Amino acid sequence: MKRKLFAYLFVLFAGEMTLACAQQNVATQVKVVNVQTDTVEVMSQKMNRGIKAVVVLPNQHFDNPTDSFPTVYVLHGAWGSYRDWPTKKNMEAIATKYGVVIVCPDGQDSWYFDSPIDPKFQFETFISKELVEYVDSHYRTFRNPKMRAITGLSMGGHGALWNAFRHPDVFGSCGSMSGGVDITKFPNKWKIDQRIGKYETNKQAWAEHAVINLVPTLKAGQNIIIDDGYSDFFYEVNCNLHKALLDAKIPHDFTIRPGAHTWEYWTNAIDYQMLFFAKAFAK
């Protein structure tokens, strides 16, 4: 009996020591307790169909039941979905770390603009109007552009800058990670022709839907961050966008570092984007 009791106490003590060591190892990580992740379907009147999105609330949303919070919209790339970011990155920890609501909508293969040829792909209206209105009416968010940001990867980087540059009254801050910011350089890729038409016969439409060609319309005031890797196939067009913004005297952050068109790069880059937005929200 004494041997059994001693063995039990030893196992209990060892378990407590293991737990203590584990707790020390994660002491610097964000503790996520009350965070809520919703998967919602938002009805688009423009497209006459529902579009899904993931909404991530921070712990603070529950700790402070009367407070409102900034919102960050995070867009996926081509061939992706609204599930990509929550699957690849701990968005709950990010939401709690910065005290923000994060929204990851489905963009299908839309390039996040309103297609001039396909009424079922009107994603600029969805992102910049219908989705924002839904989020602001269902969650405790600040309803002004200063406290609203948008970013994304690849096609989503294009979409984030496209929507922000065209709607500065909606998004006060914006970012891009490995963004396809000049679609005219890639006329036979990623179903873009299904959204605008064949490049050879619709060159003007392609030019009008390229982010880089929006630069002459911009005014200083938005907080802009652009991020890409040296080994990315979008590296050159991002450098061109950086130069265009400099020539137009539009303030922005531009980061180039080792990396390619990979999730390894984006899951690292999102941390810098979120820090940038947090500083903008605090101004």
Q: How would you describe each model-predicted region?
A:
Residues 22-283:
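Non-catalytic cap/lid and distal C-terminal segments of serine-dependent acyl enzymes
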Residues 1-27:
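Bacterial Sec-dependent N-terminal signal peptides
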